[in-house]
């Protein structure tokens, strides 16, 4: 009985993945160095990348969010839910 209970606890922990935090890119370039990553805060389950053109060229903003941010017209956005997907 104790073995069964212990097995259930282990399986539950593995399925819930307790303590997991999403990791998103935070750089503002087309490609990001591997050290430009951030562990998102609790409740932030989305990585996003917004990008738009200016007179100075392409602008990019990346980060973590609880929901996919709303953007102004002319700004493109990509939202995703896996590590380093932005």
Curated annotation (Swiss-Prot):
GO cellular component: extracellular region
InterPro entries (alphabetical): Snake_3FTx, Snake_toxin-like_sf, Snake_toxin_con_site, Toxin_cobra-type
Subcellular location, record wording: Secreted
Gene Ontology molecular function: acetylcholine receptor inhibitor activity; ion channel regulator activity; toxin activity
Name of protein: Alpha-neurotoxin homolog 8
Functional description taken from the UniProt entry: Binds and inhibits muscular and neuronal nicotinic acetylcholine receptors (nAChR).
Tissues in which the UniProt entry reports expression: Expressed by the venom gland.
Chaperone found in the keyword field: no
The keyword Isomerase appears for this protein: no
Top-rank taxon: Eukaryota
Keywords in alphabetical order: Acetylcholine receptor inhibiting toxin, Disulfide bond, Ion channel impairing toxin, Neurotoxin, Postsynaptic neurotoxin, Secreted, Signal, Toxin
Species annotation: Micrurus corallinus
Family listed: Belongs to the three-finger toxin family. Ancestral subfamily. Orphan group IV sub-subfamily.
Disulfide bridge positions per record: 24-47, 27-32, 40-64, 68-79, 80-85
Signal sequence residues: 1-21
